[in-house]
Amino acid sequence: MDYKKYRILYSPRVIDSLDKIYQYIAEEIDSVEAARRKVASIRKDINRLEIFPQAGFDVDEKFGKKLDPHYQTRGLTLSKDYIVLYTIVEDTVRLAYLLPSKSDYMKLFKTKSRYD
């Protein structure tokens, strides 16, 4: 069975978050190998969105606020420790944020627009 395959577009903010995760693990835990594994695991989870981008939860509904004025924002838990927020635009999944799941990300978005 053929599935439609979506393109994944990483925002500079998400790339920066991946870099910070890698640096933190490599420096604070002193393990480059653990840092590589964690980033690879996150990217593997993100790649699932190529086949089924609707898998994530409705962020706009959960937050009670539309984060993107033009598209529905969705969220997906990654590697147990992170959440990626994204929109689906035609055949592209646009990754907007990569956040620690233990952070108070809901509070962050109560006052901040995606375009800030």
Predicted regions and their residues:
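Arg/Lys-rich, positively charged N-terminal/basic patches that mediate binding to nucleic acids
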Residues: 1-45
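Enriched for short, Lys/Arg-rich terminal
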Residues: 74-116
